[in-house]
Amino acid sequence: MGLLSVDLLITLQILPWFFSNCLFLALYDSVVLLKHVILLLSCSKSSRGEWRRMLTSEGLRTVWNSFLLDAYKQVKLGGDAPNSKVVRVTSGCCRRRSFSGKGESECHLLDFASSNRPLVVNFGSATUPPFISQLPTFRKLVEEFSDVADFLLVYIDEAHPADGWAAPGVATKSFEVKKHRSQEERCVAAHKLLEHFSLPPQCQVVADCMDNNTNVAYGVSFERVCIVQRQKIAYLGGKGPFFYNLKEVRHWLEQTYRKRUVPTCELIM
């Protein structure tokens, strides 16, 4: 099968999912607009905020590119884990250091994997609402399973930058992040996220390089989670935001290590 035929086949596979996402964005905009109109008619002060449409040309390009990233990703369940280049994010150093893409700050994703423990890798950014909403759950996973597994958070390109396809759900000043124009800006954003959510020290934090090589290799786009074991992909989560599921990660860890959380009531008894 020729390259053109493969590209055509992938496009045909993507189209139904792409159009379903467009429909979701159109319905979302309709509901938000209706709510905005009702608030205006009721003279509510909360209606004075800016209404941001999600179904825009930039939004459509972003969604389409996310499906292309997923379709052409290098990572496959049971296959070799891509050893992508990343940059360490350490406390207090991001603002002072100059990131040229070289030097001791740069490392590889599999540097954080050990031979006898699984590595849970969580990809996302501060401007992705589903990723942010699940960070407390991820933090709990780290706290409960750090005795049997290693954890790594990879900060990628912003999903909804303030100067791009901005989302209404990230209007707070804490997460108004613009498009990264340098490695330093990306690391600073990752460091702010690390501080805001007080991630446990057992979870290492790195940032994708500016060529987005990790994002491309793992087909992340918005958010994704996977588990690396013996340099193979033991678990591969679905494409975010709709198939990003940390419950499956918990289930995998529990099934693999027969570990169950003891209910609080039993501890009291």
From Swiss-Prot:
Mind listing the UniProt keywords for this protein, alphabetically?
Endoplasmic reticulum, Membrane, Oxidoreductase, Selenocysteine, Thyroid hormones biosynthesis, Transmembrane, Transmembrane helix
Positions on the Lumenal side per record topology: 1-7
Q: Where in the cell is it found?
A: Endoplasmic reticulum membrane
Mostly located where? endoplasmic reticulum
Main enzyme class: oxidoreductase
Q: Which reaction does it catalyse?
A: 3,3',5-triiodo-L-thyronine + iodide + A + H(+) = L-thyroxine + AH2; 3,3'-diiodo-L-thyronine + iodide + A + H(+) = 3,3',5'-triiodo-L-thyronine + AH2; 3'-iodo-L-thyronine + iodide + A + H(+) = 3',5'-diiodo-L-thyronine + AH2; 3,3'-diiodothyronamine + iodide + A + H(+) = 3,3',5'-triiodothyronamine + AH2
What GO annotations for molecular function exist for this entry?
A: thyroxine 5'-deiodinase activity
What InterPro entries does the record tag this protein with? Iodothyronine_deiodinase (IPR000643), Iodothyronine_deiodinase_AS (IPR008261), Thioredoxin-like_sf (IPR036249)
Q: Please give the superkingdom of this protein's source.
A: Eukaryota
Please explain the role this protein plays, according to its UniProt record: Plays a crucial role in the metabolism of thyroid hormones (TH) and has specific roles in TH activation and inactivation by deiodination. Catalyzes the deiodination of L-thyroxine (T4) to 3,5,3'-triiodothyronine (T3), 3,3',5'-triiodothyronine (rT3) to 3,3'-diiodothyronine (3,3'-T2) and 3',5'-diiodothyronine (3',5'-T2) to 3'-monoiodothyronine (3'-T1) via outer-ring deiodination (ORD). Catalyzes the phenolic ring deiodinations of 3,3',5'-triiodothyronamine and 3',5'- diiodothyronamine.
The family assignment reads: Belongs to the iodothyronine deiodinase family.
The annotated subunit structure for this chain is: Predominantly monomer. Can form homodimers but homodimerization is not essential for enzyme activity.
Q: What is this protein called?
A: Type II iodothyronine deiodinase
Q: What is the lineage of its organism?
A: Eukaryota, Metazoa, Chordata, Craniata, Vertebrata
Query: Gene behind this chain?
Result: dio2
